[in-house]
Amino acid sequence: MSKPDEYLSSNSVPLPPQDADVLTTACDYCIVACGYKVYRWPVGKEGGAKASENALGADFPHQMMMGAWASPAQHNVVSYRDQPHHVVVIADKDATVVNPGGNHSIRGGTLAEKCYNPSNRTRERLQHPMIRVNGKLTPVSWDLATEVMADISQYIIAKYGEHAWAVKSHSYQYFENVYAITKLAMTSIGTPAFAWHDKCSATNDATGLDDAGIDSFASSYEDWADCEVAFLSGVDPYETKTTLFTSHMMPGDKKFVFVTPHMTMGVAWSVKAGRGLWLPIIPGTDTVLHMALARIIIENDWQDQPFIDKWIANSWEVDSGYGRGTRNTGWQWRTTWGTWQSDWQDYRKFILAQEESKLDVAAQITGLSADDIRTAAEWIAKPKADGSHPKTSFMCEKGNYWSNNYMNSASFASLGLICGSGNRKGRMISRGGGHQRGGLSAGGNSEWLSPEKYPGRRKKSFNLDLWLMEGNIRFAWVIGTTWVAAMMGSNALEAKMRSLTAESPHQIKSLDRAAIFETLKARVDSGGMVMANSDLYPVVPVGTDFADIVYPVASWGEDNFTRCNSERRLRLYSKFYDAPGEAKPDWWIVQKFAQKMGLDKDGGYSWKDSNDVFEEVARFSRDGVLNYHPLAEKAKASGIKAQELLRGYGTTGIQTPIRERGGELVGTVRLHDPDNDWGEIEGSTVHTKALVAFNTHSGKAILLKSPWQYAGWIQFYEAIKPRAAKGEVWVTNGRVNETWQSGFDDRRKPYLSQRWPEGFIFINPEDARKKGIESGDYVEVVNDTVYIQTGQPQGVLDADLTFNQLMADGHIKITTGRFKTIAVVSDEMRPGVCQANFNVPSSPANAVVSAVPDPMTNNYRYKLGRGVLNKVGESPYKHNFTQMSLKPRNIV
């Protein structure tokens, strides 16, 4: 008898008949977004083994690995129009972009298994709206759930103000949904209490790139194919952007410089192939590495001087376009403030004057070999025999900007710029990306109505975590995210949420609408909080323990949706089966609630389908790099729906921003490229400077300095480093290839849930030996000094938001954080550094990370956890090899 969750392999899959429905979509997971085809046909019918008898057009059996075939993980049975249907979801073998020939990752290779099927663990999907009665979630109607929420929301907004009504939301689950959510929160209600899933505030990620004038997703996949050297900071594209790496980066003979404390599979492969250099850096010290590399380049005159002369702003150009007004927004005052701003001459002097840029000093701070640093500088910048510079592209991700947010990303941008990268083929500077780009906001800018201020009383985005910890939120709607596990100081955040919700004496006792209102009114008036949660599955602990109202959400495959990947390629994600039960997409839920709130009097929430939302969003895309307005206008002129016009582009899609040339829609391969031929402006085309130049007033990039001793950084860094006397190690976190985000789908997929049934942490053998830890042991990680920022500190003087001053002013609280996980002991980790699995709700690694934002950006330093490792027993997987492989990841 097999266990309920045990993976049982199958050796057969039904073939789609010739008349099967064929729809296109893209992968729901990583930012690469490989193109897929969905074959759908009624149960009771199958195709034959001959090519003429099946929709795949192939003879079976065959031995073509990259040919047309489906594995058991690519098949499921779903409901379509209330009738059982087979679906096969396979990578598009005819694809010529993104995943040529049908290449894909293990994540995309199991897409079919995410579809709802009551015969497997997807039966755990939320299917009905629910209200928590006597501690138990009870199914109710959509009307009652939204009326209850509207009743208490109207009361809270009227008595406590819109800032007491909060939203914590995904930023990527399709244009239609994100637009609807932001329209409600930022425009209709106008609350500043809003934050994205991965941040405590509605901020940008790699702010240093933004300030330099570089769009985080300026590059195309062909740039990563065409470069001769890839400098990869805080990222292994194989693990997290698999097809970008295997289809576009591995072919050829390009070299790879990996800056990460973890030798993941991509790193190990490149080193073994003689094409890689691994720089196992101490977390948070990338800025010093960048300065040391820049110094070597400058001292040897390897910089791309013609590029610098043409494309780097001088001191006058840095200040151009501002007039006499207050530099109030972040990018304005940061790029015109002497600590960071520079031109080429000033930057050169700065680099040569920094003690930390000296090779021996940098090697000591970063923990790297001086020889390796020198080799990296040669690879990325040393001119060839003919005098030409290597075509180097620079990619950063979370290991870079989520450790020292502003300085790492700013110094990274400057390093790339002096190497002549940023706006030409094969020589780009970009993020690698995490999730796909499904965020288009309705605007409103209410997030700037924050009680906090940057130094000089400049406006600062709203810190939702801090606002909650201070007890200022009376209602919070959590949409598609694991708020607790994803944020810093997770244990303290969870405890505060629990005290405001589940531990309140005011709990719903019946489904009488009036009684519910009185109960929730009493709770909020006594300082408590009401919570609602929209998601696919019950989310620990927000949905399972705290939420008073829970909404079931329809997502990938259950409605027509749109979004872009990391090269801004827009595609339609086709609906191909029925959502379970009464589950509805976010846009529909928002609309239902808005109507109950009386916010639809102008017809602003009267969408009939997702296409209505898509067409409305189009005009809000016009001023950005995701502009698809010309497509919507062309569809309107042709008398068809915009989503249907996009459907015709299949898995190829079209790269935004979209423009018209000769009456045809044309995509944009890369941004900032002066070779982009825009010609005359046609139709609804919007021509912005960032398409042919850098995104600054002058169109030239800004070189940013990054002084290691900047008080806003160094004081925090010294406070949170591992303490040798306590036996602490760095505790960072990251992803592995097989899983996605919090594992919300993976836990319901038989093979993947068996491969990774629980959270895990990679530990170097030296660190494990000291604690008697072996692979398969349960380990508790404890940090007895987790710093939590409190209050709403006002920045007047430059020093006001530095760590020491916050501590002196009583704005830092000290707590303890801990999480339990399973050890994987391997030399793939640098000694003194452990890496826990990212965002596991039952094992939140962020519990040991301090919740003190970067004072320059208001972003957390997610990767800088620390803790003591304590063995607490053996897991059931230590001696049972049917589950959870404990093999290292640097085996290639």
From Swiss-Prot:
Entry cofactors: [3Fe-4S] cluster; Mo-bis(molybdopterin guanine dinucleotide)
Enzyme Commission code: 1.-.-.-
Keywords annotated in UniProt: 3Fe-4S, Iron, Iron-sulfur, Metal-binding, Molybdenum, Oxidoreductase, Periplasm
Record site feature (Involved in charge transfer), residues: S105
Main location: periplasm
Keyword Iron tagged: yes
GO term, biological process aspect, one: respiratory electron transport chain
Induction (record text): Abundantly expressed under iodate-respiring conditions.
Gene Ontology MF, one: molybdopterin cofactor binding
Subcellular location: Periplasm
Subunit structure: The iodate reductase (Idr) complex is composed of a molybdopterin-dependent iodate reductase (IdrA and IdrB subunits) and two associated peroxidases (IdrP1 and IdrP2).
Function: Involved in iodate respiration. Probably catalyzes the reduction of iodate (IO(3)(-)) to hypoiodous acid (HIO) and H(2)O(2), using a reduced cytochrome c as the electron donor.
Record-linked NCBIfam families: arsenite_ox_L (TIGR02693)
Name of the protein: Iodate reductase subunit IdrA
